[in-house]
Structure formats: structure tokens, C-alpha cells
A protein has these predicted regions:
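Acidic/histidine-enriched alpha-helical segments
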Residues: 46-50, 95-114, 179
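M16/insulysin-pitrilysin zinc metalloprotease superfamily fold
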Residues: 37-39, 71-105
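Conserved short loop/turn motifs at secondary-structure junctions
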Residues: 69-74, 106-112, 144-146, 171-179
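Short beta-strands and strand-coil junctions in structured, solvent-facing domains, enriched
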Residues: 15-20, 75-78, 98, 180
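Proteolytic maturation boundary segments
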Residues: 1, 179-181
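M16/MPP (pitrilysin/insulinase) zinc-metallopeptidase core fold and M16-derived inactive scaffolds
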Residues: 4-73, 119, 139-143
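Scaffold signal of the M16-like zinc-metallopeptidase fold and its non-catalytic homologs
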Residues: 33, 37-38, 83-87, 91, ...
């Protein structure tokens, strides 16, 4: 981060490898759900941050982790810094996980999967079975399987969230020009 700015991260020690076969893709679903209603941001985090002039937020899910971040937050605005910490708090265990919002993300993720399954991706998927010796690294695609993505329930996502989004699986990182007091 540059002078007068800080970046805020929640690193969640859960990714595709923690999923059972019938859950493949739920870590990625949760990543998407973090941008919808939370306990303190019922209109969603992006809407709140946009009103405050912050546009640089994102997340990604990997095999071993899910990382959420807000970048370029002006540290001269202590109220905004506090709000960003509250966002990390909500992401860590207070997503609302509304069924109607999950249906929106189901469609988005299925489209992401469809667009990502070009010839090179299909070839890479077959090669991964050999590269990773048929381990979970080869069989658990971060984006998820069509079977799981088409049929997961809101209760399954909520159970996965409560099983894995715990303090012993999380780290908060704040980098930049910030006074820790």
C-alpha cells in the first residue's frame, strides 16, 4: 500500500481440498457469498465501500485457502478503517447466506465454469490426474463440479461455512501506512 493507505485481508485456511466430493465447489460459493448480505452490511460490502469511494475489493479461492481483500483504504479516515475491520469480522463468521442470493451466485458460478472449460482447460484437467497422482489436487476443481453446483442447498452451504469458518482457521492481515493504536 502507498503512503496514507492500507490493505485489509482475511485469509481463510479452507479451499477445495477440504471439501468432500459432495461439497466440491462450496468453498468457492462461500467466496461469492461474502459480497452479499452480512450481519453489519445487509446491502452487501461492495455497496457500502463504493459509497465510501473504495472500489478495490476482491477474493479468490484456491486448493488450500480462500483470501478476501480490500485494497487502498485511506488510513486518515479512522471510521473507514474501523469499517474495514468490521467487514473482515463479518466475512469471518457473519455472512447472512440467504437462499435467494445463493441462487444468484449459483448461476454466476455455473457460467464461470462454462466459460472456463475450453480445450486447454479440459486438457489441463486430464493432465492434472497424472501430475498430482490422482490426489485431491487433481480431482477437486476449485470452481466445483456441475453436480454439486446444480444441486447444493442453502443448508449445505451454511453447514460448510460453520464447519470451516472458525478463528483457528483464519488470519487477519493489515498492511500499509497505519497506526496500530
Amino acid at each position: 500500500a502507498s503512503a496514507g493507505k492500507a490493505d485489509f485481508y482475511l485469509v481463510q485456511n479452507v479451499g477445495a481440498l477440504m471439501e468432500e466430493d459432495h461439497q466440491n465447489g462450496l468453498a468457492h460459493v462461500l467466496e461469492h457469498m461474502a459480497f452479499h448480505a452480512t450481519e453489519h452490511f445487509p446491502e452487501g460490502v461492495p455497496a457500502f465501500l463504493k459509497r465510501r469511494g473504495i472500489q478495490d475489493l476482491n477474493a479468490y479461492t484456491g486448493a488450500d485457502e480462500t483470501v478476501y481483500h480490500i485494497d487502498g483504504v485511506p488510513t486518515t479516515d479512522s471510521g473507514l478503517v474501523d469499517s474495514c475491520l468490521l467487514i473482515l469480522h463479518d466475512w469471518s463468521g457473519f455472512l447472512q447466506l440467504r437462499a435467494d442470493e445463493m441462487e444468484i451466485e449459483r448461476k454466476v458460478i455455473l457460467e464461470e465454469r462454462r466459460q472456463g472449460m475450453d480445450l486447454s482447460q479440459r486438457m489441463q484437467s486430464q493432465l492434472n490426474a497424472y501430475l498430482y497422482n490422482h490426489s485431491k489436487y487433481a480431482t477437486h476443481d476449485v470452481i466445483g463440479t456441475p453436480e454439486v453446483l446444480n444441486h447444493f442447498t442453502a443448508d449445505e452451504v451454511r453447514a460448510y461455512y460453520h464447519d470451516f469458518y472458525r478463528p483457528d482457521q483464519q488470519a487477519v492481515i493489515v498492511l500499509g501506512d497505519i497506526d496500530p493504536d
